């Protein structure tokens, strides 16, 4: 069996973990990155593509003996139509992709999981406080903007339309901006052992908002630079232990809801992207239904994964172990779609 993934996002971690669990590994990459991946001995096969259609053909070439591990770049790069043409087994529940690509469906899933979320405004006219306007899909924060009132919301949406990032206002979600500190809680759900594991926590390092924070207030006021939220890196974090029971409760609620609304439900890694308020409330503003790039911080294991496994366990390796154990128990169908 060969473990494959697209060359981006968390590919190195995924393939490193797969090799640790005894699998052959394969990266399918843009030909501009081929030389980069040649630097890593744990990657057994490197296939470079010149077009996205060729990428799909390469993936389908291993359908009889391979498993594709999805990450944030899969749908964002290939597009939904091409992903639908993939015949190779995909780790996880690919029905989640559709929910993850739509901000409004995302929030519906969180709400039905009895998870505390920010208020959502259906129309710009309803805005009565500071909001953040977000685009659909895994765009790493690109195009997001803050607005204080309905006029600023309308103005920002119009700029997105003019730049062709969206077609109309239905392609954004207007969300209350919750003041607090960000914490992105990473989890792994195993149907094989019926357990939700809290894996790690990260904070996104975003430009230019994190750079603006270093400026004195009077400079920021004078420069009049609008903050942007493009993710360029990740910072590790450990939460107060008193926060963890609520975070894990939210994760278990989320798993149960996905089983009801998106059967067979959540499989493998996911992330509840949250703000912690000064009342220690965890407010979840988004989820990712697959491996997140913040797990790249923990290639040698996280403070939490050590508590479960007592050995180095990245999410990449955890995925590979789930596949290996499922295959050994003749339950591979439970972890792929």
Swiss-Prot record:
Record domain ATP-grasp: where: 94-324
The record, for Gene3D superfamilies, names: 3.40.50.20, ATP-grasp fold, A domain, ATP-grasp fold, B domain
Q: Where does Mg(2+) bind?
A: 273, 286
Q: In which pathway does it act?
A: Purine metabolism; IMP biosynthesis via de novo pathway; 5-formamido-1-(5-phospho-D-ribosyl)imidazole-4-carboxamide from 5-amino-1-(5-phospho-D-ribosyl)imidazole-4-carboxamide (formate route): step 1/1
Q: Which GO terms describe its molecular function?
A: ATP binding; ligase activity, forming carbon-nitrogen bonds; magnesium ion binding
What catalytic activity does the UniProt entry give for this protein?
5-amino-1-(5-phospho-beta-D-ribosyl)imidazole-4-carboxamide + formate + ATP = 5-formamido-1-(5-phospho-D-ribosyl)imidazole-4-carboxamide + ADP + phosphate
**Keywords, in A-Z order:** ATP-binding, Ligase, Magnesium, Manganese, Metal-binding, Nucleotide-binding, Purine biosynthesis
Q: Which SUPFAM superfamilies match?
A: Glutathione synthetase ATP-binding domain-like, PreATP-grasp domain
Pfam families assigned: DUF1246, DUF1297
Q: How is the cofactor bound?
A: Binds 1 Mg(2+) or Mn(2+) ion per subunit.
Stored NCBIfam families: PRK13278.1-1
Q: What does this protein do?
A: Catalyzes the ATP- and formate-dependent formylation of 5-aminoimidazole-4-carboxamide-1-beta-d-ribofuranosyl 5'-monophosphate (AICAR) to 5-formaminoimidazole-4-carboxamide-1-beta-d-ribofuranosyl 5'-monophosphate (FAICAR) in the absence of folates.
Q: Know the name of this protein?
A: 5-formaminoimidazole-4-carboxamide-1-(beta)-D-ribofuranosyl 5'-monophosphate synthetase
Source organism: Saccharolobus solfataricus (strain ATCC 35092 / DSM 1617 / JCM 11322 / P2)
